[in-house]
């Protein structure tokens, strides 16, 4: 258990944690438990696995009893029961309350065949937006929708259309809660471990277990649970627990995650009552005094002060009882606050002795709005109190609001009970967009926005309505795990990528959540010029370092959607001002990877101005951005860039910014200059630097600083120190970040062209090369004459370049490659190539006359260069939660054949793309048998598909394996929209809707933080693992 958790434990032995038996669909892989996870508490562990993964290391497949041959009676019972059991495949399409958006599988069973009701767990029905379907035993499928989810207890009811099941009679299971007794042999029939049907056997061992705690997610309470040994695992949530008569006597809910064959079942008393109310069409009333009770045995009750007289009376009235109900948590400001205390032993309710949760629930549920009278013993003294019963549904959120990319709702009773706090406040259930706070997905309580209190969701909405786009406001908040500490942040309100304040309200008639745009964005206020001064370096021994401070600005970049395989939704670092008069800043492309983003430049730690992308270098890992210099009244200085390449062994001054964004200075020397290529990312291609001379220096600060410069004593910048995004490690699933120097002379032509008023339109050789030494070159067929020429041309490094990989051509264009893997390049336009900088000749030539060595033979080839403006992404389609785009440059660099121009770049949690396994790096080649070679043809085909209808996608994996995806369209939660690059638009891009009826954009609920961009894992927005 985490130290920060406020979970209370009983004085009894510490038990290992329980797990909800959901099974996640294909997307995510199991996460290792920490030692604390494995030894303390009963917190939530969702079983995330692959279809073919061996789960024996998580839970045993079945106890010994399961291996025994069933009797004929049991066989007949099972044959009847399986016809009522369904496999449920579902998504929670948006994060809500205790759960993030997700896709999973579980089990349910029919309890009313005529009206079409299915009983399953509450954590299956979901507190938030639900979308799913069920599969019957004969593999018929039909849609399901929620009609009821209990606010506290772990059960919910789904509805299906019985007429949709045509090839088998729909049968129901009778609910018999009274048949659950110790020693009864049972069978758990369900979707265990993700299988269509599993039958596990066991014997009921306890009826009086307290509800298991699942940690910081949803947990049941104020009910007893039934315990048995059945060893169910992922996917068995909601399975019926049946006796030999074929009656459902309990509902599978959870189990131990430590390998013990122990499962926990919910008694069916309250589900039966809810089902009867729904059948009659009357509300399922639920009452509460906002107090959690737990069962404690008589010996513990005596230590709390239970008198012998009351113990004798209780034992006489209920001879089989072994314990009583004791107050565990009394919520502040609730009906019981000031009247009940933790440790109170409950004796009577409304004058009747009471020791069971079922009777307590019955009284409270029938007394909403009325007073109940409780007799408790506190420290051996009788105490009578009266409490007004509240409506449990009223303190269970049934609406949420999305604004500026984040999702909010009123704090739920679940969360309030978990942390013993008052059930009030604005809860951030998806901390994203403008409200991405301290790298945590959820759990924040917002106290004030723009210095105005937000005590509830309505107050929060009214405050947010008054805040214009791009405003910066103060936010005061606390995390629910640490309410002692109040945080304050300045947030940048985004109402252009996420323009609407959108309210979602649960509709129990339709099972959907209805969306309403309740406020349009206020236009951004015009920026005003501001003054500032730069810091001065105290005690700096190098005047040049003190002066270069005025050439640094901080750059932050936020992206509304994940494109080009880039793994993060926001990134910050430092850039170098290369033209103060024009507001030009050079920054690493690992910070600004593409131009569908918001860029903010902070000057002198004081002035914040917007910036836009001017130029993206296709190979050298830098971006040039521009801000409006008229808004900056500060002595910003243009950095002077050296025209000469720095040499190995040269003395230099390292000036960089550490992880605390503080400037550091050190005198050092250049240790090496090596031609390198950043390693490709195997999981998902993304931009990486190629064919560059990387500079390393002899100082430990270089590993601590991701951005900076190398300067001479005269203050001239000799090299930029940049961060380079590398590969994702297989072990930690984190991204490696390299810190290397880039010499300035190669930057000057680009900067000079931009300063002259024209944008560079570079052309490149569409290939990746690497250095070979003369010993290799000789073996490959390079003549002695050329080896001598290389030694003369480059005395410092005798090397040539061999083609490692030729980029793949588009399937819609003719393959014009003249180079092949293994070619050794001798000259380009008759100039000997022995340095990376000498490849710059390609930037301004449509064709190059190349002399190469191929298969030991010298030959001349005419190489056609590629315009780099065609390599950048200018369009993105959001469809069923998947981000589709033209294959970007990194894909072409790593693959041998492009199968289409419809490439899956990312997908959102809880979406159809996630549910049905359409993975990032897949290519879509056809829709319903019609070829879709590009985005236009794809849009044309999917536009004719009705909502909530299955269609076929023919796809090809990155490893050239074709497969067919069957997917159901969902326009309600995931309408199709598109981002198109448009220089005339204020942000440089515009969004259009393909939702013909509602004209809604998927950007209304788009969340880059909830997207994953990799093939093999569901982890998103990971911070870099380290540097090399």
Swiss-Prot record:
One Pfam family, please name it: PDZ_6
Which residue intervals define the domain PDZ in the entry? 292-377, 878-959
Acidic residues compositional bias, start-end: 1019-1028
Sorted keywords for this record are: Apoptosis, Hydrolase, Nucleus, Protease, Repeat, Serine protease
Under which name does UniProt file this protein? Pro-apoptotic serine protease NMA111
Main localization, broad class: nucleus
Q: What class of enzyme is it?
A: hydrolase
State the compartments where it is located: Nucleus
Name of the gene: NMA111
Among PANTHER family, the record links this protein to:
PRO-APOPTOTIC SERINE PROTEASE NMA111 (PTHR46366:SF8)
Record's superkingdom?
A: Eukaryota
């Amino acid at each position: 258990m985490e130290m920060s958790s406020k979970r209370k434990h009983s004085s009894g032995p510490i038990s290992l944690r329980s797990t909800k038996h959901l099974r996640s669909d294909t997307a995510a892989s199991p996460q290792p438990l920490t030692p604390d996870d494995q030894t303390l508490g009963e917190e939530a562990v969702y079983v995330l696995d692959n279809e073919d993964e061996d789960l024996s290391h998580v839970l045993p497949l079945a106890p010994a009893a399961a291996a025994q041959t069933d009797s004929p009676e049991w066989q007949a019972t099972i044959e009847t029961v399986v016809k009522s059991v369904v496999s449920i495949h579902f998504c929670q399409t948006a994060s809500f309350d205790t759960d993030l958006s997700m896709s999973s599988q579980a089990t349910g069973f029919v309890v009313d065949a005529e009206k079409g009701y299915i009983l399953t767990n509450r954590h299956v029905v979901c507190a938030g937006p639900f979308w799913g379907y069920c599969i019957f035993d004969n593999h018929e499928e039909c849609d399901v929708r929620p009609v009821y989810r209990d606010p506290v207890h772990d059960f919910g009811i789904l509805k299906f259309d019985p007429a949709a099941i045509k090839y088998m009679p729909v049968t129901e299971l009778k609910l018999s809660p009274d048949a659950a007794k110790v020693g009864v042999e049972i069978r758990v029939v369900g979707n265990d471990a993700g299988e269509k049907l599993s039958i596990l056997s066991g014997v009921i061992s306890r009826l009086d277990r307290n509800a298991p705690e699942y940690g910081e997610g949803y947990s049941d309470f104020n009910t007893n649970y039934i315990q048995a040994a059945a060893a169910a695992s992922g996917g068995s949530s909601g399975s019926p627990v049946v006796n030999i008569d074929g009656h459902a006597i309990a509902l599978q809910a959870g189990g131990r995650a430590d390998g013990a064959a122990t499962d926990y079942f919910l008694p069916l008393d309250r589900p039966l009552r809810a089902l009867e109310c729904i059948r009659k069409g009357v509300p399922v009333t639920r009452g509460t005094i906002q107090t959690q009770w737990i069962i404690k045995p008589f010996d513990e009750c005596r230590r709390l002060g239970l008198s012998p007289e009351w113990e004798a009376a209780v034992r006489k009235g209920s001879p089989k009882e072994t314990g009583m109900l004791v107050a565990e948590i009394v919520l502040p400001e609730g009906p019981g606050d000031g009247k009940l205390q933790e440790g109170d032993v409950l004796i009577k309710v409304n004058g009747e002795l009471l020791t069971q949760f079922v009777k307590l629930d019955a009284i409270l549920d029938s007394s909403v709005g009325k007073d109940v009278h409780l007799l408790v013993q506190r420290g051996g003294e009788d105490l009578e109190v009266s409490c007004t019963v509240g409506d449990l549904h009223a303190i269970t959120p049934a609406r949420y609001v999305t604004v500026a990319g984040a999702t909010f709702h009123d704090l739920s009773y679940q969360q309030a009970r978990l942390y013993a706090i008052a059930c009030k406040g604005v809860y951030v259930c998806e901390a994203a967009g403008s409200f991405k706070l301290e790298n945590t997905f959820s759990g924040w309580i917002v106290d004030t926005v723009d210095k105005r209190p937000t005590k509830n969701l309505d107050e929060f909405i009214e405050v947010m309505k008054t805040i214009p786009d791009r405003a910066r406001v103060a936010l005061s908040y606390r995390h629910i795990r640490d309410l002692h500490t109040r945080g304050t942040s300045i947030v940048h309100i985004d109402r252009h990528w996420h323009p609407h304040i959108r309210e979602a309200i649960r509709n129990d008639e339709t099972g959907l959540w209805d969306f309403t745009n309740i406020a349009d964005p206020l236009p951004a206020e015009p920026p005003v010029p501001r003054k500032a001064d730069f810091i001065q370096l105290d005690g700096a021994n190098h005047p040049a370092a003190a002066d270069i401070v005025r050439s640094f600005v901080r750059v932050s970049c936020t992206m509304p959607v994940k494109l080009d395989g880039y793994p993060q939704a926001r990134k910050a670092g430092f850039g170098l001002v290369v033209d103060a008069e024009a507001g030009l800043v050079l920054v690493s492309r690992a910070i600004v990877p593409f131009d569908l983003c918001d860029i903010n430049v902070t000057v002198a730690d004081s002035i914040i101005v917007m910036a836009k992308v001017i130029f993206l270098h296709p190979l050298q890992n830098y971006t040039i951005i521009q801000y409006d210099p008229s808004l900056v009244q500060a002595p910003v200085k243009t950095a002077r860039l050296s025209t000469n390449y720095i040499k190995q062994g040269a003395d230099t001054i390292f000036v960089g910014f550490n992880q605390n964004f503080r400037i550091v200075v050190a005198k050092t020397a250049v240790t090496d200059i090596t031609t390198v290529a950043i390693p490709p990312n195997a999981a998902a291609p993304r931009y990486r630097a190629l064919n560059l001379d990387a500079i390393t220096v002899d100082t430990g600060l270089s590993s601590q600083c991701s951005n900076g410069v190398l300067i001479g004593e005269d203050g001239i910048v000799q090299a930029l120190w940049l961060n380079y995004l590398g590969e994702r490690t297989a072990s930690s699933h984190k991204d490696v970040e390299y810190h290397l120097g880039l010499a300035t002379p190669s930057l000057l032509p680009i900067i000079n062209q931009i300063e002259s008023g024209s944008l560079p339109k570079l052309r490149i050789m569409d290939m990746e090369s690497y250095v070979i030494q003369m010993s290799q070159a000789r073996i490959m067929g390079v003549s002695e004459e050329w080896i001598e020429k290389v030694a003369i041309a480059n005395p410092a490094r005798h090397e040539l370049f061999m083609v490692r990989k030729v980029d793949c051509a588009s399937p819609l264009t003719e393959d014009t490659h003249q180079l092949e893997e293994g070619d050794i390049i001798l000259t380009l336009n008759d100039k000997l190539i022995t340095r990376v900088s000498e490849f710059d000749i390609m930037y301004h030539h449509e064709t190059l006359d190349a002399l190469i060595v191929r298969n030991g033979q010298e030959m001349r080839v005419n190489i056609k260069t590629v315009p780099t403006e065609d390599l950048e992404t200018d369009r993105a389609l959001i469809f069923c939660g998947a981000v589709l785009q033209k294959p970007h440059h990194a894909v072409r660099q790593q693959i041998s054949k492009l199968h289409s121009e419809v490439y899956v770049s990312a997908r959102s949690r809880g979406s159809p793309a996630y549910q049905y396994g359409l993975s990032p790096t897949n290519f879509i080649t056809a829709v319903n048998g019609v070829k879709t070679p590009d985005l236009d043809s794809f849009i044309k085909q999917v536009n004719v598909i009705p909502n909530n209808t299955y269609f076929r996608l023919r796809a090809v994996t990155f490893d050239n394996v074709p497969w067919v995806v069957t997917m159901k369209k969902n326009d309600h939660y995931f309408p199709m929209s598109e981002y198109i690059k448009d220089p005339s638009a204020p942000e440089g891009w515009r969004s259009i809707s393909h939702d013909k009826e509602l004209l809604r954009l998927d950007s209304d609920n788009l969340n880059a933080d909830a997207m994953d961009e990799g093939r093999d894992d569901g982890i998103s927005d990971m911070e870099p693992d380290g540097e090399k």
